[in-house]
Amino acid sequence: MEAIFCGVGEAFDKHLSNTSILVVDDSQGSRRQVLLDCGFSAPGPFWCHALDPSALDAVWISHFHGDHFLGLPQLMLRLFEEGRRQPLTIVCQTGGGATIKAAMQLAYPGFSEKLTY
């Protein structure tokens, strides 16, 4: 298992992007990738550090502060633009689906209806 730090800063750090960690596990003979948190500054570093961004299996959201989840709309849009079709699992607290849908609608109105994954 490998942990790739895509960011180690806090919400208002002017030098480092939000804390976000890409966990890559090859132990079962197939690669699994999980992104731990996806704050507003996390998508760019994720694309720089991920070996295969389209192979992302899941995103785990620790809690619903902007610096932990507001990068999700950008991440999902980019995956869509690059042709992603397989499902993306999002793990979050109970009731978080409505919060994510609201963020998607605010960031890119109508986009979530176009998602094919």
PLM region spans:
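Binuclear metal-dependent hydrolase catalytic cores
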Residues: 1-117
